[in-house]
Amino acid sequence: MKLWDVVAVCLVLLHTASAFPLPAGKRLLEAPAEDHSLGHRRVPFALTSDSNMPEDYPDQFDDVMDFIQATIKRLKRSPDKQAAALPRRERNRQAAAASPENSRGKGRRGQRGKNRGCVLTAIHLNVTDLGLGYETKEELIFRYCSGSCESAETMYDKILKNLSRSRRLTSDKVGQACCRPVAFDDDLSFLDDNLVYHILRKHSAKRCGCI
């Protein structure tokens, strides 16, 4: 319950207590008849009491005040406990919700890596790292083809594979489709450490296919 809700409840209770009927021992005097002989009207009402006011005031008012004070004290103590408890529950819910998602995500990533086809992959290298005997500080983005070509197999490829397994084609080796470049990047020109000019042609893949 918020603070304003408690204040509203307290106001309603105070209004209810103030609307209680007068306690026993208090009564209203009836209005006296008009005195025509004196030519003026006396005071119409008067309040009389058999006892003092503080002793006859309803006990319910004290109960209402006690309830209001207890509610305010309880409300002051509760926010800190709720603030400490809610984050724990929220963290537990988030952890429980994240675990299945993480496991499903890992499963999907594993399936994509296992069943992916022939794709183009890039890596940042130095020309010297290519192992062609060049000593240079020149760098490049080397792209290569990788992946499986099983999904690209035609009926012809399947028949050849079956015949090879059954040893019907023992005299010949049957080649399988592999992931290869079908187009290459532009030529790469560079100077080595001895200021010798070199050109690399068809050095990096541009598009890949199963051939």
UniProtKB/Swiss-Prot annotation:
Chain positions carrying an annotated carbohydrate: 126, 162
Induction notes from the record: Expression in C6 glioma cells was transiently induced by treatment with phorbol myristate acetate (PMA), but not by forskolin.
MF terms in GO: glial cell-derived neurotrophic factor receptor binding; growth factor activity; protein homodimerization activity; receptor tyrosine kinase binding; transforming growth factor beta receptor binding
Keyword line: Cleavage on pair of basic residues, Disulfide bond, Glycoprotein, Growth factor, Secreted, Signal
Superkingdom in the source lineage: Eukaryota
Record-given protein name: Glial cell line-derived neurotrophic factor
The keyword Secreted is annotated on this UniProt entry: yes
Gene Ontology biological process terms in this record: branching involved in ureteric bud morphogenesis; cell surface receptor protein tyrosine kinase signaling pathway; commissural neuron axon guidance; dorsal spinal cord development; embryonic organ development; enteric nervous system development; glial cell-derived neurotrophic factor receptor signaling pathway; mesenchymal to epithelial transition involved in metanephros morphogenesis
GO cellular component terms listed in the entry, alphabetical order: extracellular region; extracellular space; Golgi apparatus
Compartments in which it is found: Secreted
Complex and partners: Homodimer; disulfide-linked. Interacts with GFRA1 coreceptor and RET: forms a 2:2:2 ternary complex composed of GDNF ligand, GFRA1 and RET receptor. Interacts (via propeptide) with SORL1 (via N-terminal ectodomain); this interaction affects GDNF-regulated, but not constitutive secretion. Also interacts with SORL1 in complex with GFRA1; this interaction leads to GDNF endocytosis and lysosomal degradation.
Underlying gene: Gdnf
Propiece residue ranges: 20-75
Annotated source species: Mus musculus (Mouse)
Function recorded in the entry: Neurotrophic factor that enhances survival and morphological differentiation of dopaminergic neurons and increases their high-affinity dopamine uptake. Acts by binding to its coreceptor, GFRA1, leading to autophosphorylation and activation of the RET receptor. Involved in the development of the neural crest.
Annotated Gene3D superfamilies: Cystine-knot cytokines (2.10.90.10)
Signal peptide feature range: 1-19
Disulfide bonds: 118-179, 145-208, 149-210
Stretches for region Disordered: 76-113
Tissue specificity of this protein: Expressed in both the central nervous system (CNS) and in non-CNS tissues. Expressed in a highly dynamic pattern in the anterior neuroectoderm during the early stages of neurogenesis between 7.5 dpc and 10.5 dpc. Beginning at 10.5 dpc, expression begins in mesenchymal tissues of several organs including the digestive tract, kidney, testis, frontonasal mass, tooth primordium, tongue, mandible, whisker follicles, ear, eye, limb bud and in distinct regions of the brain. Also expressed in the heart, ileum, liver and muscle.
Keyword Glycoprotein: yes
Major localization class: secreted
Family to which this protein belongs: Belongs to the TGF-beta family. GDNF subfamily.
